[in-house]
């Protein structure tokens, strides 16, 4: 993060010609287990990772917000918070910031303008929530600058609202919530219905290894929508609000009444919720052997019942599994059809995992992976 801090300070100084008063950060995240459970009112178990979006900022006496984007060649955006805040077709990055500020105002928070420079190292397009980190860091920045009486949960909800309503991209609450509320060396069990969060301690030195398959993700939106519709259909047949409300016993008793495809989709969600709740308990107790089993079962369920993995991702999981055995867990993470795997790896096996993947993955698939070795880190807050 040191480089990011230097970059945002330097950009602030050079473009705005004075020094910032505050440095604020918000992290990206990875979901350890609980996939496609969020829109079924279920449970997820993400952790914040030490790839962040960082802001240098200072208050202004007027109502102007000026933003410098370091990652877009110090491109700037400027808007007046007392005027209508509009969507910028030709400057997509700025809409996340405009949306967050607009939603804060709509929620009744009062503040004046700000000068902001922003940069991040959360890999974009890898499903590690670079957009949520940006939304949360902007909310956090206004909280810090103006001592706003806003909870971390509301900063998260405000960011989600900005993405859904202003940017126009549907997302659940997980990404913003873990970015806003994460704890070092902890994952977070999130109940996607009540939004209740529980910090779950992780083995102190466990590495969180994220490997991007770099498989281009085709069909994601249409397949995602189909899965969602199938889950909603299953919930209707069971007469419940969401699949969260169906036990595996109830499912087994009625599975024969469901269309075979719908039954497979429902079985994944119902068993994944059970796995996620159990994973929170076994992770906290340090039982990595059981965690390894739960993550393996999650991956198999995504592959066979939810059918969202691809051969390249399955290959990556197999390569890592062969190295770590029962010492850690590995599974696909994210929406599917490409993307990343996540592995909980004891530190002494990290180099071995990297070596095996570098030796075997490209040879088997023709694709070159990207590897990120992370730790579970704190959520958004003031750095300086």
Curated annotation (Swiss-Prot):
Q: Which UniProt keywords apply?
A: ATP-binding, Carbohydrate metabolism, Cytoplasm, Galactose metabolism, Kinase, Magnesium, Metal-binding, Nucleotide-binding, Transferase
Enzyme category, top tier: transferase
GO biological process, alphabetically ordered:
galactose metabolic process
Q: What is its EC number?
A: 2.7.1.6
Q: Which residues form the active site?
A: 175 (proton acceptor)
Q: Where does substrate bind?
A: 35-38, 224
Q: Which domain of life is it from?
A: Bacteria
Which residues of the sequence carry a binding annotation for Mg(2+)?
131, 163
Residues with site note (Transition state stabilizer): 29
Specify which residues bind ATP according to the UniProt entry for this protein: 69, 125-131
The primary site where this protein sits is: cytoplasm
The record's annotation in Pfam families points to: GalKase_gal_bdg, GHMP_kinases_C, GHMP_kinases_N
Q: Which PANTHER family match?
A: GALACTOKINASE-RELATED, MEVALONATE KINASE/GALACTOKINASE
Please state which protein family the record places this protein in.
Belongs to the GHMP kinase family. GalK subfamily.
Function, as annotated: Catalyzes the transfer of the gamma-phosphate of ATP to D-galactose to form alpha-D-galactose-1-phosphate (Gal-1-P).
> What name goes with this protein?
Galactokinase
């Amino acid at each position: 993060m040191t480089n990011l801090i230097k970059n945002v300070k330097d950009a602030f100084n050079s473009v705005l010609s004075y020094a910032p008063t505050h440095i604020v950060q918000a992290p990206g995240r990875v979901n350890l287990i609980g996939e496609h459970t969020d829109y079924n009112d279920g449970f997820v178990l993400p952790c914040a990772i030490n790839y962040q979006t960082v802001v240098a900022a200072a208050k202004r006496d007027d109502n102007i917000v000026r933003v410098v984007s370091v990652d877009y060649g110090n491109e700037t955006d400027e808007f007046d918070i007392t005027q209508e805040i509009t969507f910028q077709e030709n400057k997509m990055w700025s809409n996340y910031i405009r949306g967050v500020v607009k939603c804060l105002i709509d929620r009744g928070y009062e503040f004046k303008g700000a000068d902001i420079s922003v940069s991040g190292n959360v890999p974009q397009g890898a499903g590690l929530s670079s957009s949520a980190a940006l939304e949360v860091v902007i909310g956090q920045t206004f909280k810090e600058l103006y001592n706003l009486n806003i909870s971390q949960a509301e900063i998260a909800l405000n960011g989600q609202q900005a993405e859904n309503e202003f940017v126009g991209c549907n997302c659940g609450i997980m990404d913003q919530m873990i970015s806003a509320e994460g704890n070092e060396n902890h994952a977070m069990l999130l109940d996607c219905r009540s939004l209740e969060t529980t910090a779950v301690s992780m083995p102190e030195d466990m590495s969180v290894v994220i490997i991007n398959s770099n498989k281009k993700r085709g069909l994601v939106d249409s397949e995602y929508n189909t899965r969602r519709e199938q889950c909603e259909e299953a919930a209707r047949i069971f007469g419940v609000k969401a699949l969260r409300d169906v036990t595996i016993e109830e499912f087994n008793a009625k599975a024969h009444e469901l269309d075979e495809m719908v039954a497979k989709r429902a079985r994944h969600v119902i068993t994944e919720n059970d796995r996620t709740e159990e994973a929170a308990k076994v992770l906290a107790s340090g039982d990595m052997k059981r965690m390894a089993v739960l993550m393996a079962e999650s991956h198999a369920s995504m592959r066979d019942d939810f059918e969202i993995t691809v051969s390249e991702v399955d290959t990556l999981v197999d390569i890592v599994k062969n190295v770590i055995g029962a010492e850690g867990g590995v599974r696909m993470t994210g929406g599917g059809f490409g993307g990343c795997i996540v592995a909980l790896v004891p530190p002494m096996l990290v180099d071995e995992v990297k070596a095996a993947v570098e030796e075997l993955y490209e040879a088997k698939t023709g694709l070159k992976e990207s590897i990120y070795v992370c730790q579970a880190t704190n959520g958004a807050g003031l750095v300086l």
